[in-house]
């Protein structure tokens, strides 16, 4: 395999959704990441541990496919890591500005104190009426 793609699901999603992308990305190994994080600060620890483990095993080039809040968590947790490419599906890119959502104080403080600096080549797919992206 030339590229390992880690699928990061959205809220209420599952790592099994990775199966949908295997047929679309021949030549890539697509792996579903079964994360438990419910906040960006939990994702920072959990995602970093998982991705650093892959890198230490010499897995070669690593990319991500991330959906909705999974994309936001990925950008928070993996911004400084060596990621070859990212594919985002209806990503939440700014948690503070989601229409109709009021963040609790802890989330708001986190978002303001941890601006995202994402420098990974990224492809974004979203629907015409998507109001989260």
Where are these regions (language model features)?
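Short, surface-exposed "cap/lid" segments of acyl-processing enzymes
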Residues: 1-40
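Acidic catalytic loop of the alpha/beta-hydrolase fold
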Residues: 13-14, 128-133
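Alpha/beta-hydrolase active-site loop
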Residues: 17, 37-56
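Active-site nucleophile loop of the alpha/beta-hydrolase fold
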Residues: 35-38, 87-97
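Conserved alpha/beta-hydrolase fold motif
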Residues: 61-64, 86
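Gly/Ala-rich beta-loop-alpha elbow adjacent to hydrolase catalytic centers
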Residues: 65-74
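Aromatic pocket-lining residues of Rossmann-like dinucleotide-binding sites
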Residues: 77-81
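Short beta-strand/loop motif that positions the catalytic acidic residue
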Residues: 118, 124-126, 130
């Amino acid at each position: 395999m030339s590229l390992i793609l880690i699928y990061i699901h959205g809220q209420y999603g599952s790592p099994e959704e990775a199966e949908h992308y295997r047929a679309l990305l021949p030549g890539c190994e697509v792996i579903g990441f079964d994360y438990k994080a419910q906040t960006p600060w939990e994702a920072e620890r959990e995602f970093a541990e998982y991705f650093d483990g892959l890198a230490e095993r010499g897995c070669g080039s690593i990319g991500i496919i991330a959906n909705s809040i999974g994309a936001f968590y990925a950008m928070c947790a993996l911004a400084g890591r060596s990621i070859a490419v990212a594919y985002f599906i209806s990503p939440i890119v700014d948690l503070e500005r989601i229409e109709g959502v009021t963040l609790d104080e802890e989330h708001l403080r986190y978002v303001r104190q941890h601006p995202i600096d994402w420098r990974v080549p990224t492809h974004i797919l979203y629907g015409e009426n998507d109001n989260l992206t």
